[in-house]
Amino acid sequence: LYDKGHLNAALIVSPKGVYTNWKNEQIQRHMPDHVLYKIVVWNPNPTKKEKEELNFLFEEKNVLTIFLMNIEAFSTKKGQDIATKFLLGHNAMFAIDESTTIKTPTAARTKAVVKLRQLAKYRRILTGSPVTKSPLDLYAQAEFLDPEFCLCVQV
């Protein structure tokens, strides 16, 4: 999608213990060599250097901008605000790693993530644990992907 000019950024959200793995391993392992990219990791209490990196998210550049956040950030206004600003400023993919973290439709972070989905040009979910306790566990994940998926169901 990046090579075809359809997107210029990605917001990747995962649990706290996992999201730094994206920076340290996953992105460089799977990114094609010809793609120039910059990774910025969310920290709710950034150092001076981290503040400069956060500012990079909103500057025009010719690289793929990747913003990594933990899912817990969406329980806070600060986290929601920066994710909103990022998505509004880019043609972005919004990806949720370990998407079972948004399985509870009534949870604050699930509501925040689902609300922000409309700002992303593309959405993806990833999970290594597709087994659920109930079919309703899939509802919020499906709603994140496609807002029209469950038009007749109200939770």
What residues fall within each predicted segment?
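Conserved beta-strand->loop/alpha-helix structural units within folded catalytic cores of enzymes
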Residues: 1, 14-16, 128-137
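SF2 helicase/translocase NTPase motor core
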Residues: 2-109, 115-121, 149, 153-155
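PAPS/PAP-binding and catalytic site of the sulfotransferase fold
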Residues: 26-29, 134-145
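Conserved helicase ATPase motor motifs in RecA-like P-loop NTPase domains
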Residues: 120-135, 143
